[in-house]
Swiss-Prot record:
It holds the Pfam family TLV_coat. It comes from FBJ murine osteosarcoma virus (FBJ-MSV). This is Envelope glycoprotein. The chain crosses the membrane at residues 152-172. A motif (CX6CC) lies at residues 96-104. Residues 41-90, 100-136 form a coiled coil. A lipid is attached at C171 (S-palmitoyl cysteine). The mature envelope protein (Env) consists of a trimer of SU-TM heterodimers attached by a labile interchain disulfide bond. The surface protein (SU) attaches the virus to the host cell by binding to its receptor. This interaction triggers the refolding of the transmembrane protein (TM) and is thought to activate its fusogenic potential by unmasking its fusion peptide. Fusion occurs at the host cell plasma membrane. The transmembrane protein (TM) acts as a class I viral fusion protein. Under the current model, the protein has at least 3 conformational states: pre-fusion native state, pre-hairpin intermediate state, and post-fusion hairpin state. During viral and target cell membrane fusion, the coiled coil regions (heptad repeats) assume a trimer-of-hairpins structure, positioning the fusion peptide in close proximity to the C-terminal region of the ectodomain. The formation of this structure appears to drive apposition and subsequent fusion of viral and target cell membranes.
Length: 211
């Protein structure tokens, strides 16, 4: 009778392990989907941010370069007008003498701006080449076809997890079942030993006197 009870107890244990393994499988697939999607979205957002910063720096460089050209053109116009006014007031000793004011002199610092913009363009070019060299084939494929790479990265993780479970799941399940069987056998032996000691401790004379 005890062996039958032990046999009935093993079936729910195996069923529980199967359900547990199935739950771990589904949980692993869900976790793989979530992890792959999150990593892909984070990488895409980082690349978009980097590209946006690169474009903004290019626009700033172009704007400052245009301002430098405009300032250079304006200074040429001002100097040309100054020379013309000096010729008109040549008899009075020039424009400053006619106005009886100190003469203003033009200090050209556009060369520093021009050099800074040239260095900025060079750094932007180097950064763009470095970014393209570090970009892998998967990222290049993502830039060409985002939906396809999203599908691949989403499915790849769960497929790998499912393949690992199919390869190692039966072995692990058999080990767990064997371990539980061994534990049940030990418990069964302990129970039988305890019952044997209880029967052995009973005095036969007391049993006969009761009868």
């Amino acid at each position: 009778q005890f062996k039958r009870r032990a046999k009935y107890k093993r079936e729910p244990v195996s069923l529980t392990l199967a359900l547990l393994l199935g739950g771990l499988t589904m949980g692993g697939i869900a976790a793989g989907v979530g992890t792959g999607t999150t990593a892909l979205v984070a990488t895409q957002q980082f690349q978009q941010l980097q590209a946006a910063m690169h474009d903004d720096l290019k626009k700033v460089e172009k704007s400052i370069t245009n301002l430098e050209k405009s300032l250079t053109s304006l200074s040429e116009v001002v100097l040309q007008n100054r020379r013309g006014l000096d010729l008109l007031f040549l008899k009075e000793g020039g424009l400053c003498a006619a106005l009886k004011e100190e003469c203003c002199f033009y200090a050209d610092h556009t060369g520093l701006v021009r050099d800074s913009m040239a260095k900025l363009r060079e750094r932007l070019s180097q950064r763009q080449k470095l970014f393209e060299s570090q970009q892998g084939w998967f990222e290049g494929l993502f830039n060409k076809s985002p939906w396809f790479t999203t599908l691949i990265s989403t499915i790849m993780g769960p497929l790998i997890i499912l393949l690992l479970i199919l390869l190692f799941g039966p072995c692990i399940l058999n080990r767990l079942v064997q371990f539980i069987k061994d534990r049940i056998s030990v418990v069964q032996a302990l129970v039988l030993t305890q019952q044997y000691h209880q029967l052995k401790s009973i005095d036969p004379e007391k049993v006969e006197s009761r009868e």
